[in-house]
Amino acid sequence: MIHPFASALLRWYAQNGRDLPWRHTTDPYPIWLSEVILQQTRIEQGRDYWHRFMEQYPTVEHLADASEDEVLRLWQGLGYYSRARNLHTAAKQIKELGSFPTTLHGIKMLKGVGDYTAAAIASFAFGEAAAVVDGNVYRVLSRHFGIGTPINSTEGKKEFAALAQELLPESQAAAYNQAIMDFGATQCTPKSPACDRCPIADTCQALHTHAVDMLPVKLKKLTIKTRHLQYIYIRVNGEIAIRRRPAGDIWQGLWEPLLIENAPIPPFDGTLTLLRQKVKHVLTHRVLYADFYLLEATTKPTLPPEFIWIPESDLDRYALPRLIELLTQSLTP
């Protein structure tokens, strides 16, 4: 028997569900691609990127055969670049396997695929009765059932995962998962939820106890760190110097001009011009402040061995962090 909560959401979804292109297929590749893109990305922006990826890489084999630079370049502007690297690695895994994994366990073995993404793919593509638990699901369940356990605690994750699975109608897993996510995204929103026209308001514990704005509960966030960056864009006879960022730090694998951090700028031959100062750029756990300089010289300065010189006109072939993209807009030929 389907739980009354699930039945109400399915009825609501039949009338109010979002029409998204990846919902018109059971092919796991476009579904997986959409789930990865939509992590930390609004649907309005993510939809455009999904179309670009599907056009450039219509199958998982096409994606697997691409270079990492090509994938990062197409991803540019979405942020959280580890998603793109994991996507590319997982595509190679799938190609090596010969086909997309068809079980929840098999899908979880793919690089970068966690519990939520695996459950989404398993239910949407293969009809497996695997409940999704994302931010929308946490919010809907915590409010409706009046659960105050912090959603980012170990106890909370277990409690909500168990409840989500208990409520899931096995024969309609895909529709229900989409329903509860859409309900959280458009109806039971973080701020100003539409409680006055909610189809399950009569049984909502948070509404009846005036706790809607207090749920879900989260543990205190991590401390935000501040970094001050000085970038020097070196231009010599139509060429510029860039390097690939190393592993273990932000923007791994992307390209950047000369970075000087926590040190004064050394003397250079040529003309050094400050173009932008204290440009603020916010990441998840960091706030960056960047100064951007242009160094124009007639001879190439000595740089660390990881730097390469490229024609300035070729810069758009390299995947850059969004901050560097913004800073290079200050340049004139």
Which residues fall in each region the model found?
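Catalytic cores of DNA base-excision repair glycosylases
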Residues: 3-8, 12-194, 200-213
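Intrinsically disordered, low-complexity, charged terminal extensions of DNA damage-control enzymes
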Residues: 1-18, 24, 185-333
